Amino acid sequence: MGLFDKLKSLVSDDKKDTGTIEIIAPLSGEIVNIEDVPDVVFAEKIVGDGIAIKPTGNKMVAPVDGTIGKIFETNHAFSIESDSGVELFVHFGIDTVELKGEGFKRIAEEGQRVKVGDTVIEFDLPLLEEKAKSTLTPVVISNMDEIKELIKLSGSVTVGETPVIRIKK
């Protein structure tokens, strides 16, 4: 892709024409390879493929326009289905279920329609860095059988703004 093509894609709204769907950062931080998550369920992509984020912020937001599916009782993870039919699972940290909700506050509700950037869960990062096995947060696509192409991005990301994954169905 040349410079002009890249610039055109930045100012153009024809993403739907190309069939590319962008997954936006559900939290601020640094992208990490999913294979580096210290949990076999995520590292071996048992629940889906994607990326992980080492968080620096204090909230998880909707990474797509869509509908919140399940928010775990302990408020450490949620699922969302995008308007384009992509099913995503965002899971804060590893073994954070053992904290029984400590450090997490639910903002959104199950079944709620959300837009990219709408807050779903707030969290206390210093507390979770102290108590959780890991704060690496997997962001995975759980209906990979419907995905033709998955492009994982890298680098620092800003909650609700920076793309982390581009996919084609």
Swiss-Prot record:
PROSITE patterns linked: PTS_EIIA_TYPE_1, PTS_EIIA_TYPE_1_HIS
Positions of modified residues (Phosphohistidine): H91
The PTS EIIA type-1 domain, residue ranges: 39-143
Disrupted-gene phenotype: In mutants defective in enzyme I and histidine-containing phosphate carrier protein (HPr), cells lacking this gene are able to grow on the non-PTS compounds such as glycerol, maltose, melibiose, mannose 6-phosphate, and alpha-glycerol phosphate.
Site (Important for phospho-donor activity): H76
Residues given in the record as Zn(2+) binding sites: H76, H91
Textual note on the cofactor: Binds 1 zinc ion per glycerol kinase EIIA-Glc dimer. The zinc ion is important for dimerization.
Outcome following mutation: H76Q: Unable to transfer phosphoryl group
MF-aspect GO terms: kinase activity; metal ion binding
Keyword Nucleotide-binding: no
Keywords: Cytoplasm, Kinase, Metal-binding, Phosphoprotein, Phosphotransferase system, Sugar transport, Transferase, Transport, Zinc
Effect annotated for changing F4W: Same activity as the wild-type
Gene Ontology biological process terms in this record: negative regulation of carbohydrate metabolic process; negative regulation of maltose transport; negative regulation of transmembrane transport; phosphoenolpyruvate-dependent sugar phosphotransferase system; regulation of carbohydrate utilization
Any one Gene Ontology cellular component term annotated for this protein: enzyme IIA-maltose transporter complex
Claim: Disulfide bond is one of the keywords in the record: no
Cofactor: Zn(2+)
Compartment(s): Cytoplasm
Xref: InterPro entries: Dup_hybrid_motif (IPR011055), PTS_EIIA_1_perm (IPR001127), PTS_EIIA_component (IPR050890)
Active site: H91
Domain characteristics, as noted in the entry: The EIIA domain is phosphorylated by phospho-HPr on a histidyl residue. Then, it transfers the phosphoryl group to the EIIB domain.
Protein task: The phosphoenolpyruvate-dependent sugar phosphotransferase system (sugar PTS), a major carbohydrate active transport system, catalyzes the phosphorylation of incoming sugar substrates concomitantly with their translocation across the cell membrane. The enzyme II complex composed of PtsG and Crr is involved in glucose transport. The non-phosphorylated EIII-Glc is an inhibitor for uptake of certain sugars such as maltose, melibiose, lactose, and glycerol. Phosphorylated EIII-Glc, however, may be an activator for adenylate cyclase. It is an important regulatory protein for cell metabolism.
Self-association and partners: Heterodimer with glycerol kinase (glpk).
Name of this chain's protein: PTS system glucose-specific EIIA component
Organism the protein comes from: Escherichia coli (strain K12)
Origin organism lineage: Bacteria, Pseudomonadati, Pseudomonadota, Gammaproteobacteria, Enterobacterales
Record gene name: crr
